[in-house]
């Protein structure tokens, strides 16, 4: 697939079409590829991301104190989460990487994927302003925010499940990707959460693998707390 088609697919998955295609190209260009790379856009996008996620949490959990909100935000914007969202968008297929990074599999490296996603947020901000950039961020992160149970000290379902099992001295869960649904630009991931003791299997569906894992963990928590 040529670059134009890959870029079109990425924009469709992102839910935003760039007016200035040069910004998209820059956001997708790693420093190993050329001088006009995405590092400055990443700097902008990091701020857009943090502000947008902070607002999402502020609106969703009016009773949570600042400390809990900060912990939740840190969990949502960490590299692992960003890389999984980037993977769901198939962002790696569109990256411009130098020959060395290509050979070493840089298009799969979590740090490169996470940085590129932040660069995209920065590029949308420059292309259309903060409101549109925030909309793009919220479209990707609101499903993760919706899975958080505020009654569980603001902890996400995977963390809660791990703590429940550890408190009972039971083995930790295993998460397996069962499959995907939908078109390439709008895929949903299906993940199974397996507990060895007590024997339990739950399934979750989400727009990213992480979101699906969280949903499967949420169901497992509910079963264990019955």
Curated annotation (Swiss-Prot):
Cofactor(s) demanded: Mg(2+)
Catalytic activity from the UniProt record: Endonucleolytic cleavage to 5'-phosphomonoester
Pfam families registered for this protein in UniProt: dsrm, Ribonucleas_3_3
Keywords: Cytoplasm, Endonuclease, Hydrolase, Magnesium, Metal-binding, mRNA processing, Nuclease, RNA-binding, rRNA processing, rRNA-binding, tRNA processing
PROSITE patterns hit by this protein: DS_RBD, RNASE_3_1, RNASE_3_2
Record-linked SUPFAM superfamilies: dsRNA-binding domain-like, RNase III domain-like
Subcellular location: Cytoplasm
Family: Belongs to the ribonuclease III family.
Functional note: Digests double-stranded RNA. Involved in the processing of primary rRNA transcript to yield the immediate precursors to the large and small rRNAs (23S and 16S). Processes some mRNAs, and tRNAs when they are encoded in the rRNA operon. Processes pre-crRNA and tracrRNA of type II CRISPR loci if present in the organism.
Name this protein carries in UniProt: Ribonuclease 3
Source organism of the structure: Thiobacillus denitrificans (strain ATCC 25259 / T1)
Chain's gene name: rnc
């Amino acid at each position: 697939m040529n670059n134009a088609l890959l870029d079109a697919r990425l924009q469709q998955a992102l839910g935003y079409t760039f007016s200035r295609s040069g910004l998209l190209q820059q956001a997708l260009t790693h420093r190993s590829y050329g001088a006009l790379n995405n590092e400055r856009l990443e700097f902008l996008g990091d701020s857009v991301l943090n502000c947008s996620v902070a607002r999402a949490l502020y609106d969703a959990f009016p009773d949570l104190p600042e400390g809990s909100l900060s912990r939740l935000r840190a969990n949502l914007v960490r590299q692992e989460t960003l890389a999984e969202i980037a993977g769901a968008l198939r962002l790696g297929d569109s990256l411009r990487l130098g020959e060395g990074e290509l050979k070493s599999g840089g298009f799969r490296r979590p740090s490169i994927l996470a940085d590129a996603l932040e660069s995209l947020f920065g590029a949308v901000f420059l292309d259309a302003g903060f409101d549109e950039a925030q909309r793009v961020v919220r479209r990707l992160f609101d499903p993760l925010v919706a899975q958080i149970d505020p009654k569980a000290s603001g902890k996400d379902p995977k963390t809660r499940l791990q703590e429940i099992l550890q408190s009972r001295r039971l083995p930790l869960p295993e998460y397996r990707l069962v499959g995907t649904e939908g078109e390439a630009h709008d895929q949903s991931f299906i993940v199974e959460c397996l507990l060895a003791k007590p024997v339990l299997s739950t399934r979750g569906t989400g727009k990213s693998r992480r979101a699906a894992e969280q949903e499967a963990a949420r169901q497992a928590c509910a079963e264990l707390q019955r």
